[in-house]
């Protein structure tokens, strides 16, 4: 069985890639429903390859299980798609009844809109209880997708300011009546120019 999302995110693919590799973004995506906490003391700034043990708490209060997030990345595919793959497994809680957990996230430029991101997310599960857990996981994925769409515009870096856009920079084009560097006022019809 599987749960999947296919979304257009209002941010460029580089920003989306940084976001899905961020434990902070993960925490914001699931909040306030689920609160992931590192079992290793603290989350890294950016997810790296390997295992990361996490405890999940409902509403930040009630432990609902642990998860081994086991990550690998494909960042340089010929088709330009970047992939993050979580092949981890539930460590405790109801999800341990699943026999398979395979989660893949793909980032690519949106077709015809290179400043936006095509985001694809697929979770495959199996086991005798998979049919019973499918709907709760599907619901959580819908929440996650809605949060991604909401948060994506905030993921971009602020643009670098050009030299004459920097605060306090003198562009030489003072507006009429605006104070100049020496405190006098510039008037567009000043005949002393």
Annotate the PLM regions.
Residues 1-50, 192-193:
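Hydrophobic ligand-binding cavity/cleft-lining segments
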Residues 120-166:
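A conserved amphipathic terminal alpha-helix motif
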Residues 28, 37-92:
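Glycine-rich portal/gate segments that line the openings of hydrophobic small-molecule binding cavities
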Residues 1-6, 13-15, 51, 83, ...:
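Intrinsic-disorder/low-complexity, polar/charged segments enriched in Ser/Thr/Lys/Arg/Asp/Glu/Gln
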Residues 8-12, 57-59, 108, 122-126:
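Solvent-exposed residues in well-ordered beta-strands and their adjoining turns
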Residues 2-4, 64-70, 98-104:
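Short, surface-exposed coil-to-beta transition loops
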Residues 150-173, 177, 181-193:
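Short, highly charged C-terminal tails/helix-capping segments
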Residues 81-139:
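Beta-strand/loop substructures that line and gate deep hydrophobic ligand-binding cavities in soluble
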């Amino acid at each position: 069985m599987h749960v999947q999302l296919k979304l257009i995110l209002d941010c460029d693919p580089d920003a989306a890639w940084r976001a899905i590799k961020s434990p902070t973004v993960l925490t914001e995506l699931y909040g306030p429903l689920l609160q992931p906490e590192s079992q290793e003391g603290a989350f890294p700034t950016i997810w790296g390859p390997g295992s990361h043990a996490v405890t999940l708490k409902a509403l930040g209060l009630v432990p609902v299980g642990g998860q081994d997030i086991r990550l690998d990345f494909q960042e340089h595919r010929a088709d330009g798609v970047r992939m993050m793959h979580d092949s981890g497994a539930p460590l405790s809680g109801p999800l341990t009844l699943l026999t398979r957990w395979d989660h893949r996230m793909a980032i690519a430029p949106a077709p015809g809109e290179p400043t936006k991101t095509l985001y694809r997310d697929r979770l495959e599960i199996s086991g005798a209880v998979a049919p019973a857990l499918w709907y709760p996981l599907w619901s959580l994925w819908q929440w996650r997708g809605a949060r991604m769409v909401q948060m994506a515009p905030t993921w971009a870096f602020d643009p670098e300011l050009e030299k004459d856009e920097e605060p306090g920079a003198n562009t030489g084009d003072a507006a009429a009546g605006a104070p100049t560097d020496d405190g006098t006022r510039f008037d567009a019809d000043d005949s002393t120019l």
